[in-house]
């Protein structure tokens, strides 16, 4: 029997110390990594529930274990809410991550050696869109498209590559692209060569759910996403589709289980259900609108301070700061800003002369600060402080001044009140 009063602090003080330190870091540092956000206490409560104890291989109403009547309720709630959120008629909430959701789509619809056409990681794509170091680039013949000199997706190049290589699947989506994607154009290109259109909307799923970014579900054969990032849920993955035929649905269902996964993480699925309910609330739309306003305020301020934003600005939650020609690398900029309690990530930019371990860019995003309550003026201030540090990355006095300002701002907007 486990006594209910045992806490991590008393049983495992070493781990408790690390958790406490991370909790304090999240309160004291401003979070600008575009793929990070804060979950609600309700989501965390679900993840910490006794649902973690339950094995539930299979799907609601069709399990390989007994005793699943209550976890069936949790998973069905997640499925129904997810369908409502995106106007989907198919939803799978079992993928453990966005990468595994993507893997499921590839394995369901392709054979090893088939050609896929995806966005280059160096130009804003994702590892799982055909990067050579990823399984998607090893198991499949991955052809990569990129952006033009203006930092925009070159749809003519995408079409030319599709006509030349005849991919079985066209992959649309990104990890570092700040403009609106023309999903209809991608579908037209895919149709020209008889390919599937697969969209990974992990970064913009929350914006799509709120109607502030175009939905790919009207155009794609299948769509995946993570459930954290702009959706503000637990870390996990989903697969959705609209108008999918029965054969496609069967392939997707059977590849997630038993194809690539065994038992689903029922406590995480419960957390997803909570997050989807939160995303259906009226306030979620206002939150996502503010995310975009904050990103635009930040990007415009950085441009005014002499920093180049790839594509010239942003229409979503993120921006990519191009520092080619600057004296500071992405790696050094990340470190200097970290000392000032501003958390960012270094990122390669198009035609980057530096290695991916050093880079000439920074990726910034506003989902987390917007969750804290930041509005445009706060992000203007933040962008000016970022520019101050980037202008003098080795000046301890500047870093100390910015750190003090950031600390005051964080106290004004606590993560958890």
Swiss-Prot record:
User: What Pfam families does the record point to?
Assistant: SHMT
Q: What does the record give as cofactor? A: pyridoxal 5'-phosphate
E.C. number(s) listed in UniProt: 2.1.2.1
Q: Which domain of life is it from?
A: Bacteria
In the record, N6-(pyridoxal phosphate)lysine modifications are located at 229
Binding sites annotated in the UniProt record for (6S)-5,6,7,8-tetrahydrofolate: 121, 125-127, 355-357
Which EC class is the enzyme in?
A: transferase
Give the intrachain disulfide bonds: none
* Record localization: Cytoplasm
Supply the SUPFAM superfamilies for this chain.
PLP-dependent transferases
What is any one GO biological process for this UniProt entry?
A: glycine biosynthetic process from serine
Q: Which reaction does it catalyse?
A: (6R)-5,10-methylene-5,6,7,8-tetrahydrofolate + glycine + H2O = (6S)-5,6,7,8-tetrahydrofolate + L-serine
UniProt GO cellular component terms? cytosol
What molecular function terms (GO) are annotated for this protein? Answer: glycine hydroxymethyltransferase activity; pyridoxal phosphate binding
Q: What is its main location?
A: cytoplasm
Signal sequence segment: none
UniProt cross-references to CDD domains, sorted A to Z: SHMT
Which pathway does the protein contribute to?
One-carbon metabolism; tetrahydrofolate interconversion; Amino-acid biosynthesis; glycine biosynthesis; glycine from L-serine: step 1/1
The site feature described as Plays an important role in substrate specificity is recorded at 228
Q: Which UniProt keywords apply?
A: Amino-acid biosynthesis, Cytoplasm, One-carbon metabolism, Pyridoxal phosphate, Transferase
Quaternary structure? Answer: Homodimer.
Function noted in UniProt: Catalyzes the reversible interconversion of serine and glycine with tetrahydrofolate (THF) serving as the one-carbon carrier. This reaction serves as the major source of one-carbon groups required for the biosynthesis of purines, thymidylate, methionine, and other important biomolecules. Also exhibits THF-independent aldolase activity toward beta-hydroxyamino acids, producing glycine and aldehydes, via a retro-aldol mechanism.
Give the similarity note. Belongs to the SHMT family.
Quote the protein name from its UniProt record.
Answer: Serine hydroxymethyltransferase
What organism, scientifically named, is this protein from?
Stenotrophomonas maltophilia (strain K279a)
Q: Which gene encodes it?
A: glyA
């Amino acid at each position: 029997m486990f006594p209910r009063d045992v806490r991590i602090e008393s049983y495992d003080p070493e781990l408790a110390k690390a958790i406490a330190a991370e909790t304090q870091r999240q309160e004291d540092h401003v979070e600008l990594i575009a793929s990070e956000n804060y979950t609600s206490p309700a989501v965390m409560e679900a993840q910490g529930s006794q649902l973690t104890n339950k094995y539930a291989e299979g799907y609601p109403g069709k399990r390989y274990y007994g005793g699943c009547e209550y976890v069936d309720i949790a998973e069905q709630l997640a499925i129904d809410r997810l369908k409502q959120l995106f106007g989907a008629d198919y939803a799978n909430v079992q993928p453990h991550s966005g990468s595994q959701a993507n893997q499921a789509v590839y394995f369901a619809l392709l054979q090893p050696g088939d050609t896929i056409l995806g966005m280059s990681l160096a130009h804003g794509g994702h590892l799982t869109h055909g990067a050579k170091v990823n399984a998607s680039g090893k198991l499949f013949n991955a052809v990569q498209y990129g952006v033009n000199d203006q930092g925009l997706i070159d749809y003519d190049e995408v079409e030319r590559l599709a006509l030349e290589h005849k991919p079985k699947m066209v992959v649309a989506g990104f990890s570092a692209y700040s403009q609106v994607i023309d999903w209809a154009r991608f579908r037209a290109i895919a149709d020209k060569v008889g390919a599937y259109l697969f969209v990974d909307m992990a970064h913009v799923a929350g914006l799509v759910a709120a109607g502030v970014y175009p939905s790919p579900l009207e155009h794609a054969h299948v769509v995946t996403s993570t459930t954290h990032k702009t959706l503000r849920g637990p870390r996990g993955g989903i697969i959705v589709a609209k108008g999918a035929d029965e054969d496609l649905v069967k392939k997707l269902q059977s590849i997630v289980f038993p194809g690539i996964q065994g038992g689903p993480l029922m406590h995480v699925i419960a957390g997803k259900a909570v997050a989807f309910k939160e995303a259906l609330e009226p306030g979620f739309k206002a939150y996502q609108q503010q995310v975009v306003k904050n990103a635009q305020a930040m990007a415009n301020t950085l441009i005014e301070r002499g920093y180049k934003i790839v594509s010239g600005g942003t229409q979503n939650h993120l921006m990519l700061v191009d520092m080619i020609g600057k004296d500071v690398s992405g790696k050094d900029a990340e470190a200097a800003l970290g000392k000032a309690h501003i958390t960012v990530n270094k990122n390669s930019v198009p035609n980057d002369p530096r290695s991916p371990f050093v880079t000439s860019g920074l990726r910034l995003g506003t989902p987390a600060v917007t969750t804290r309550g930041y509005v445009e003026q706060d992000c203007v201030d933040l962008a000016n402080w970022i520019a101050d540090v980037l202008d003098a990355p080795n000046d301890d006095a500047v870093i100390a001044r910015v750190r003090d300002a950031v600390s005051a701002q964080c106290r004004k907007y606590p993560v958890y009140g």
